A protein has these predicted regions:
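Short, structured interface segments
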Residues: 36-51
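Zn2+-dependent cytidine deaminase-like catalytic core
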Residues: 1-40, 184-186
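Enzymes that bind and transform nitrogen-containing heteroaromatic metabolites
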Residues: 10, 17-22, 50, 57-234
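Short, well-ordered coil/turn segments that N-cap beta-strands
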Residues: 29, 54-56
Length: 234
């Protein structure tokens, strides 16, 4: 039989909260907890955040040119990062429960926001903030058969949106929208992680981003393909 169990991190889920350890101890099994607790907490980051806040962990992912521009209005909407970077974005989508954009992104890019470049058994929920109902009924997001929440007159603001997603057990939300949507989240202090992908290109007719990242205390650097990446957390 089992004589001893080592638990890295307690379960904060209010439906469980310590009951598992109590059951083991009542059965005469010795329980040790706290081994590699910090590492376990990092691995369960989104789940712990959801349990404690009943809202998803919010990640922003944005790509800019070398000057901080998010788009080049001299061209048709197109990707300006490498294939390797795109694969990392699809992995990020796979690791998420929902992807969010605003109406401007759907109108400009007509994106799919699905996982296609890595193997997956499910697609994330796509969320569109469109309070003025400007998105065309023919948009790919509304017609591909994958899960979507199109928020029009029923949009009640960002805190209410995060509460709704939390009630749906969405544990991680990735924002892939443009600067308007992202800045609304930043201004309300609702972003937990900010992933800035920096391309080597220079836009001819740039769209400045003007993101205020002063609320983030930590930054890590990485590479997604040839692109440099800065990951900001609190």
């Amino acid at each position: 039989g089992i004589n001893e169990v080592i638990v890295a991190h307690g379960d904060p889920n209010p439906l469980v909260r310590g009951n598992g350890i109590s059951v083991l101890e009542q059965a005469g099994i010795k329980v040790q907890s706290g081994l590699l607790e910090k590492e376990a907490a990092e691995q369960m980051r989104e789940f712990l955040h959801w349990c404690q806040n009943r809202r998803p962990y919010v990640t922003v992912k944005i790509a800019t040119d070398s000057t901080g521009s998010v788009d080049d209005l001299s061209l048709e909407a197109q990707r300006f990062t490498s294939d390797e970077c795109l694969e990392r974005v699809h992995q990020l989508r796979k690791d998420s429960c929902a992807i969010l954009v605003g109406a401007n992104t759907v109108i400009r890019d007509d994106p799919q926001l699905t996982v296609r470049l890595v193997q997956t058994d499910r697609q994330p929920l796509r969320v569109i903030i469109d309070p003025n109902n400007r998105v065309s009924p023919s948009a790919k997001l509304l017609n591909d058969g994958n899960p979507v929440q199109h928020l029009t007159e029923n949009f009640r603001g960002l805190p209410a949106l995060l509460d709704m997603l939390g009630d749906m057990e969405i544990q991680r939300l990735v924002i892939e929208g443009g600067p308007t949507t992202i800045n609304y989240f930043l201004e309300d202090g609702l972003v937990d992680e900010f992933i800035h992908v920096i391309s080597e290109v220079n836009h001819v007719k740039p769209v400045p981003s003007n993101f205020d990242l002063s609320s983030f205390s930590k930054v890590e650097t990485s590479n997604w393909g040839i692109e440099k990446v800065k990951i900001y957390t609190k």
